[in-house]
């Protein structure tokens, strides 16, 4: 697998711009769904049952603590494909109530010297309803966390309504939530870390959760650059 990637797939993908290569990778994953035994082969290679890695956190039993963070499966369409690679959970999104295009292109840049990518997509996604339709159609075979955010066109004073809307639509179809208030690529989003905005968002989600029979953990995605004083 490594040899094939390094000497065949990587040169092909690197001949395209990063976003096109990203989309081609997902097209490849879709293709593998129709290849007999492809999923079984991937699970055999990457998915290992290791009892010592199992964790009980937030009332959820995780097969292992290594998950796929939000930002890759933006629309909640590849959670089972990603599970084949052995992830203990998959975070979908960020998802917003309405579809949005994200930032203008180009918005993804390779940094070969650091073997890294700079991501400035800006929460492009097809919207919560699209994700819900897919979750209804394809039952998750992995723990799914929904990363939710507000639409870029929504002013911060109305942000809590966006989070409420996304939360309510997704509640019955995912295992946990991540409230995204820290994407630096979206103008004004990090301002939601201010306690006045944040307390309104969290209070509304906690109140809304009380109406459901099943408990869903709510996690908060904050900026990694906040000081301990700011976090307090």
Question: What kind of feature is each model-predicted range?
Answer:
Residues 59-63, 67, 71-73, 77-98:
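Active-site cofactor/substrate anionic-group-binding motifs, chiefly glycine-
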Residues 93-143:
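A gly/proline- and charged-residue-enriched helix-loop-helix capping module
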């Amino acid at each position: 697998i490594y040899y094939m990637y390094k000497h065949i797939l990587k040169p092909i993908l690197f001949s395209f711009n990063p976003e096109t290569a990203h989309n081609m990778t997902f097209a490849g994953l879709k293709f593998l769904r129709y290849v007999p035994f492809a999923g079984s082969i991937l699970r055999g290679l990457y998915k290992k049952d290791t009892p010592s890695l199992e964790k009980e956190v937030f009332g959820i039993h995780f097969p292992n603590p290594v998950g796929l963070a939000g930002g890759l499966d933006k629309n909640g369409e590849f959670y089972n494909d990603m599970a084949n690679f052995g992830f203990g959970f998959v975070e979908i999104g960020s998802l917003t109530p309405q579809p949005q295009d994200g930032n203008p292109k180009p918005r993804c840049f390779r940094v070969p010297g650091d073997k890294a990518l700079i991501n400035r997509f800006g929460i492009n996604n097809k919207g919560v309803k699209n994700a819900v339709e897919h979750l209804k159609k394809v039952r998750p075979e992995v723990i799914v966390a929904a990363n939710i955010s507000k639409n870029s066109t929504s002013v911060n004073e109305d942000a809590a309504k966006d989070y409420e809307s996304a939360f309510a639509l997704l509640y019955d179809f995912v295992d946990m939530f991540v409230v995204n208030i820290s994407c630096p690529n979206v103008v004004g989003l990090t301002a939601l870390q201010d306690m006045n905005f944040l307390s309104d968002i969290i209070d509304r989600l906690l109140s809304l959760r009380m109406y459901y029979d099943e408990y869903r953990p709510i996690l908060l995605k904050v900026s990694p650059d906040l000081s301990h004083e700011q976090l307090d």
